[in-house]
């Protein structure tokens, strides 16, 4: 697993460097964009709103699961689309295998519908530099993500500058890959601790904040985290915190 992960990360790094050869279709600076960011705690209804808006592809460019975890760069997306185009000429065996994996493996995830072609949280992009809340799913220790929960207050200025540039570059690459859409759309529970960062990068950004009854939200969040830790990690107690749900 470690070898496969290393190869995948190396391929992404090389592709990232090669993206500069493609140029940029958009002349606007990041600060001139008007992305829409959906904020809210885990299990507060953000996914439903996000995926509903994401269907309006004329206005919104939302990242899909495959774009986040398999192809965050433009070069990778062009390569995979080319492979699928050739695959289609031979009866699409690769596409069928992907759909089977999507249905049998990702479809088994509870609480939160997951699919390669579903709009998903771009917090997954921060797994590449290992610097986001999703690290918590693999290593469920509070100290592992403590600083990232309160990003604006606790992340050091030096690391913050690096991660800010990285996140803005990911958005630029995504917009360049989707010229049919006008605005970037994203939702993340982690945005609650990154409002200053988002406003700093995108002064013209728009925000939607969702609230849910705290008791119902907390119980749902505990159920989701219990499932996630069982699915991604190997806890001594199969569903930790389930008693709070």
What is each residue range found by the language model?
Residues 68-184:
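PAPS-dependent sulfation machinery
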Residues 1-13:
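Charged, amphipathic alpha-helical linker segments immediately N-terminal to NTP-binding catalytic cores
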Residues 56-66:
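Post-Walker A helix-loop "phosphate-sensing" segment adjacent to the P-loop in P-loop NTPases
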Residues 188, 192, 198, 238-245:
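Anion-recognition interface
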Residues 219-245:
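PAPS-dependent sulfotransferase catalytic core
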Residues 198-223:
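Conserved phosphate-donor/acceptor-positioning beta-strand/loop module used by diverse small-molecule
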Residues 17-35:
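N-terminal signal-anchor transmembrane helix
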Residues 37-58:
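Glycine-rich phosphate-binding P-loop
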């Amino acid at each position: 697993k470690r070898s496969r992960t290393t190869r995948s990360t190396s391929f992404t790094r090389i592709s990232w460097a090669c993206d500069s050869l493609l140029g940029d279709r958009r002349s606007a600076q990041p600060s001139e964009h008007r992305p829409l960011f959906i904020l809210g705690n885990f299990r507060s209804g953000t996914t439903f709103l996000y995926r509903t808006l994401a269907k309006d592809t004329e206005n919104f460019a939302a990242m899909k699961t495959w774009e986040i975890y398999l192809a965050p760069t433009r070069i990778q997306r062009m390569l995979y689309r080319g492979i699928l185009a050739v695959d289609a000429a031979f009866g699409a065996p690769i596409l069928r295998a992907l759909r089977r994996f999507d249905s049998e493996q990702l479809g088994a995830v509870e609480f939160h519908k997951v699919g390669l072609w579903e709009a998903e949280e771009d917090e997954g992009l921060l797994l590449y530099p290992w610097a986001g809340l999703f690290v918590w799913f693999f290593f469920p220790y509070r100290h592992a993500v403590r600083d990232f929960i309160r990003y604006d207050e606790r992340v050091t200025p030096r690391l913050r500058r690096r991660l800010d540039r990285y996140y803005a570059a990911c958005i630029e690459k995504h917009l360049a890959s989707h010229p049919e859409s006008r605005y970037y759309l994203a939702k993340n529970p982690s945005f609650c601790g990154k409002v200053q960062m988002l406003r700093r990068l995108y002064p013209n950004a728009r925000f939607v904040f969702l609230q849910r009854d705290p008791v119902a939200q907390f119980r749902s969040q505990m159920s989701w985290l219990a499932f996630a830790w069982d699915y991604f990690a190997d806890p001594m107690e199969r569903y930790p915190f389930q008693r709070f749900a």
